[in-house]
Amino acid sequence: MYIHNLDPVLLDFGLIVIRWYSLAYIFGIVIGWWFGKKIIIHILKNTNFKFKLDDFDDFISYLIISIIVGGRIGYVIFYNFNYYILNPLEIIKVWEGGMSFHGALIGIVIGTYLFSKKKSISMFFILDIIACVAPIGIFLGRIANFINSELIGKVTSASWGVIFPLVDTLPRHPSQLYEAMLEGVTLFLILNILIFKRKYKVGSSSYLFLIYYGFFRILSEIFREPDAQIGYVFSFFSMGTILSFFMILSGFVISGILKKNEI
């Protein structure tokens, strides 16, 4: 049994406060950008695909905006709509927390579509790169969730249960760490082994990401408490489970479309 005593704040300089959660976003994007370029170089070296590395650098600004705007709007719509419709000014207070992975994903797809149209390049190629590096940010984000004592797991009698004093005195599944290992480490290994060891096909990493992430998230939701302001939908499904189901469905649909059109 472990009693959680980690401080969400890394450094406090008074007016300037550095939090682990903020660093997770920053390092996730920076490391993802660096590794994404490695993947692009590998693909360009082993295929006839044409793409400018500078375009990926330009895309990062679109990515950052897409993650923040999409993640925030997704949280507002999916998880706390009634509150924010009555308190619209609270929506802009991103620093107080409240981001949705599924909302960020939708934002990334929209941002990538707009960027690809502007540059006249393949949207699915960029999404493939994002799919391969996204688990890095997901891993860091879930570790930050654990440090923050948020997205807590269900009560357990297992020896590895964690007590979060900021929540209550009950031992709980460290569901954040389960997600870090499944949606972060495992998903990263699957997608990158495939893209480095097999012949690259545009769009393949994108739909595999949707399918595998959706599956891992649904599995993790079994051990995770539902969001307090929503609870269970239809007395059984968490919002994360429902949204992840549609991710899996979208993954299979995209797979079928790409194979049909031989993209």
Please tell me what each predicted stretch does.
Residues 1-263:
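A feature for loop-to-transmembrane-helix boundaries and adjacent hydrophobic helices
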